Amino acid sequence: SGGFDFSFLPQPPQEKHDGGRYYLGPGPMGLMGPRGPPGASGAPGPQGFQGPAGEPGEPGQTGPAGARGPAGPPGKAGGVVGPQGARGFPGTPGLPGFKGIRGHNGLDGLKGQPGAPGVKGEPGAPGENGTPGQTGARGLPGERGRVGAPGPAGARGSDGSVGPVGPAGPIGSAGPPGFPGAPGPKGELGPVGSTGPSGPAGPRGEQGLPGVSGPVGPPGNPGANGLTGAKGAAGLPGVAGAPGLPGPRARGLVGEPGPAGSKGESGGEPGSAGPQGPPGSSGEEGKRGPSGESGSTGPTGPPGLRGGPGSRAGVIGPAGARGASGPAGVRGRPGEPGLMGARGLPGSPGNVGPAGKEGPVGLPGIDGRPGPIGPAGARGEAGNIGFPGPKGPAGDPGKAGEKGAGNRGAPGPDGNNGAQGPPGLQGVQGGKGEQGPAGPPGFQGLPGPAGTTGEAGKPGERGIPGEFGLPGPAGPRGERGPPGESGAVGPSGAIGSRGPSGPPGPDGNKGEPGVVGAPGGSGGLPGERGAAGIPGGKGEKGETGLRGEVGTTGRDGARGAPGAVGAPGPAGATGDRGEAGAAGPAGPAGPRGSPGERGEVGPAGPNGFAGPAGAAGQPGAKGERGTKGPKGENGIVGPTGPVGSAGPAGPNGPAGPAGSRGDGGPPGATGFPGAAGRTGPPGPSGITGPPGPPGAAGKEGLRGPRGDQGPVGRGETGAGGPPGFTGEKGPSGEPGTAGPPGTAGPQGLLGAPGILGLPGSRGERGLPGVAGAVGEPGPLGIGPPGARGGRDGNPGSDGPPGRDGLPGHKGYAGNGPVGAAGAPGPHGVGPAGKHGNRGEPGPVGSVGPVGALGPRGPSGPQGIRGDKGEPGDKGPRGLPGLKGHNGLQGLPGLAGHHGDQGAPGPVGPAGPRGPAGPSGPAGKDGRTGHPGAVGPAGIRGSQGSQGPSGPPGPPGPPGPPGASGGGYDFGYEGDFYRA
């Protein structure tokens, strides 16, 4: 309590008071002693009160952006369009559809949230022109005009006290105008009075000349996408001949290639592309597979013209009839090896046919060199399958015969489908098309007639206000443009009758106390009204003077002539908007001004604040409800046909003239959703885009029905894999005749993509590939011929799959004709035989003539698997083998990225005007327009009628002192008065 705080000194270990503080009296401070030893810690003091909350901290800095998360699952269709998701990993791109023609713009609505990009659909059918809407209700009256110049100052009254207001006398005749008086002293400007309530609206003036159009305002905010038109009818897609399943291996060796066939004509028009699914998650990269086959190279068609984006995706039309396959074209250059796709589903193993009887042993070669192969013995009857006997001793390897040089045999009948082959090369992805507007979810009703939006008018100069003409139909709401410049002052109109009094202004500053006036005499003669002087500024309010005695009421003076109109004063501040008065009668329309030149488009400014909603217009006539079309039934999903080669893209038609944009019609009622239209004819395929990264392996989908067998195609020979283990020799088939080529089945409708399954386990190894040609002769064996070993065992079951070898050298394309596909042979049933012992490789004999290809014999029972032989030395690479069977249909790949946006195509012909859509909500107030040019002076307005008298205003400030009246001064109680 008034002492010093010694809490900073070390304290002895005694009880603390007041949280360790000691307060001394006001005595003098002693010298500081030596520092003592530190005391023991005291008991903890009581807990202090909680302090006030601290000031809020500064906002933290924005942290670094997190790593990009994985792509989310695809959203459900429908609902409000959401933001565009991150771009997924590209999948295998489908054939791009032909871009539709862009429809007309709909009415501008509120901008929706951007949604997931919809699939690009086919062009909608152009709608019909709508009827113009009814005239909207008359708009509210405009804002009040600016405050006029102040009127002339009144003459100074006498110094007498204010008497009661007498009755108004008759208005005398106006005298001659007096000379203007000398200007009074300029007072200080008082504060601006608040605007009072507005009086009733006066009669409308005559319509002024229209102002000159100002420059075009900035473009408005983009409206929502208009309603999409109904789908066009779908044409029948053309068919392309697809490669059929190849025939089984021929027993004979490959002969000399025949002459190249002429290039066949391409099939029909390609079918339209189905809708693209949502992007899936990225999958693991599959193993690198052998090279796919390169198709026949067709002539490069001219690049098609790009169409505008369609409004919505079309449904896939029914498959067209299969076109006849053209003759095989010249083989193209070998393609680059593609990435190996996911392993396909294992094919059902073929049934093994019964073992044939052994043929006679060939003649031994001369001098150990390979001799010619003897003629094939007649095929014996198939015997019953016996149980495998005991394993005999391994015989010496026989000598291989020389390679024959006979003609190539006719292709045999098709065998069973093998396991799925590796996917072929992916084409180059085409350029990204223009993104069409996101379609609304689901089918929408029949769109109303689309009003054409007029150009934004140029803001005119403010002319002399004329009378209101009949209101026209409400135009689209534009953005507020920049404020226009004030118009030139028009000629002064005739002085109208006195209007109602304005609201009372604020009190002026208080002035000095005035001198008390002497009692006035009774009934002085009224002086003439002087001419109006130049209006002076508003003086400060003086001090309230002593109230004089009430004088007798003077007579009304004669009304003076109206003074000269003073110079216009500065414009007052714009008052608040008054209440709307009653609408006056419509005046005659003034002459229409010449349209101004269109100004340059100004830069887009920020959005203005929303203004008050205008009066609701009359509802437009409700459009007639269209007849609901029958709902189409889904067709039966046909078997998946082979993919045809893409035809050349046709050129787009010439661009038609752009239609004019009409006025916006009234909002039409939303109709019921119409039936889905038929799919339009498919357009030519675009250029295939570059391959995307491989997608993840999907779940195994349901196996689709097997398609009809197509004609045999001949592709490039794939790269040879590593040599597998040699199986035992199977029985030779009986020679048969080549079957007729099978007929191509119709192309099935494209089914919906199946749900991607989890990656399945690795399936069994597929059927063995075609055997390669005989290699170069090996070293000659030494020794006498050994005894013949046991008979060849039945084919064993496949071993585990070997590792993929490096891609081998591609064979060169042959030029022989393609044989016709044979009819599939019957499936044999039986177990597989076991593997026999692998013999030592003998010398290679000369090749004998190729025998005729026999029909496929019935499969024998599968024998017991034999012991695995020792792998022999790797021989030189053989000739390219025959093409294997087409594999099973692979699972659909993930959807690929959209490519980069391509160059915009030429504008197509404008379609007919569609029906008007429903009116969107009112947009925000536009930005203030650019200042327009000064318009011509308007027509002089008519003189208005006298309005009702307003409330009396407050007393004005005291005027300047008047001229002396010839009185005399006298004193009264210390004050001087003048009589």
Curated annotation (Swiss-Prot):
Residues 622-631, 865-876 have a biased composition (Basic and acidic residues). Residues 1-979 are annotated as: Disordered. Prolines at the third position of the tripeptide repeating unit (G-X-Y) are hydroxylated in some or all of the chains. The modification 5-hydroxylysine is found at residue 99. Residues 427-436, 517-527, 659-668, 710-724, 778-788 have a biased composition (Gly residues). One of its GO terms (cellular component) is extracellular matrix. It is found in: Secreted; Secreted, Extracellular space; Secreted, Extracellular space, Extracellular matrix. Expressed in bones. Residues 24-70, 147-176, 222-263, 272-282, 312-331, 363-382, 483-500, 550-594, 601-621, 639-649, 669-679, 725-759, 767-777, 840-855 have a biased composition (Low complexity). Keywords: Extracellular matrix, Glycoprotein, Hydroxylation, Secreted. Its main location: secreted. One of its GO terms (biological process) is extracellular matrix organization. GO terms for molecular function: extracellular matrix structural constituent conferring tensile strength. Glycans are attached at residue 99. The modification 4-hydroxyproline is found at residues 10, 13, 38, 44, 334, 337. Residues 949-961 have a biased composition (Pro residues). It comes from the Eukaryota. Transmembrane segments: none annotated. It holds the Pfam family Collagen. The keyword Secreted applies. Type I collagen is a member of group I collagen (fibrillar forming collagen). Trimers of one alpha 2(I) and two alpha 1(I) chains. Interacts (via C-terminus) with TMEM131 (via PapD-L domain); the interaction is direct and is involved in assembly and TRAPPIII ER-to-Golgi transport complex-dependent secretion of collagen. Belongs to the fibrillar collagen family. This is Collagen alpha-2(I) chain. It comes from Bradypus variegatus.
